[in-house]
Amino acid sequence: IIQIKNVTKTFIGKDNQVEALKGISLDINKGDIYGIIGMSGAGKSTLVRCLNYLEKPTTGTVVVEDQDLSTLTEAELRKVRTGIAMIFQHFNLLMQRSVLDNVCFPMEIVGVKKQAARKRAMELLEIVGLKEKADAYPSQLSGGQKQRVAIARALANTPKILLCDEATSALDPTTTKEILKLLQDINKQYGITIVIITHEMAVVQEICSHVAIIDAGELAEHGTVEEVFSRPQS
C-alpha cells in the first residue's frame, strides 16, 4: 500500500544543510502494523511527513496505493490525504469543542451532513469505549481518553492508513498498553494499515508485524519484528 523508494530529504538553513533522510527504501503492505523506530532526531517524523507529502522528499518517490505522490496536483494530493489519518503525541484536540464535536470535525470539513456526522461520531466513540463522554470537553479527560478521542476522530473519514507519531509517549505504561490494544483491534477489524513512529522498543514488540530502524537519517535495518529483534545489528 506504501512504497518508499530511495527517499532523501535535505533541509537547507542559512549557514548549513541537514540531511534528515538518506536514501530510504521501504515497502509497507496493506493491513500491516509497521513500526518505525529510532532515537529522537533520527528522521522518523520527517519520514512520516513524507508519507503524506506534508514534506516533499528532496529526491526519491513515495507511492501510495499505486499513485506516485510527486505526480499529483494539490487537489489530487488532498484526496489521497483523506485516506491517510494521523494521531500525535499531544492529541491535538480542539479544546473549546465537546468530544462529539471533535470527532465530527473532519466530517464537517468534507461536507458530511450534521445528522449523519453525529451518528457516525457516536459509533466511533463506541468503538473507542468513550460513548458516555460524548458531551464532555477535552480538559475533563485523562491522557488515555484524549488519545481515544483522537483515534475516533482519525477514523471519521474511513482512512485506509493510520499514521501514529509517538502516539503513546505521553502516556503511562498501563494506558499505553490499552491504546496499543485498541489500535490492534482496529487493524484487525477494519483492515486499516497502521504505521507507528516511536522511540520505544516495547511498543514495536507489543503490536508491530514489521519494523524499520532509522538511525541518523539512514535505514539501519528492516524486516519482520522477529527477524530484526532476534539478530540485532544496530
Regions picked out by a protein language model, each given a short descriptive name:
Residues 52:
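Helix-to-loop junction immediately C-terminal to a conserved catalytic motif
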Residues 137-141, 145:
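Conserved ABC ATPase signature
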Residues 67-68, 104, 108, 115-132:
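Conserved ABC ATPase "signature" region
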Residues 156-160:
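A short, proline-enriched helix->beta-strand linker immediately N-terminal to the Walker B motif
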Residues 204-206:
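A short, surface-exposed alpha-helical micro-motif characterized by mixed small hydrophobic
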Residues 222-223:
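ABC ATPase "signature
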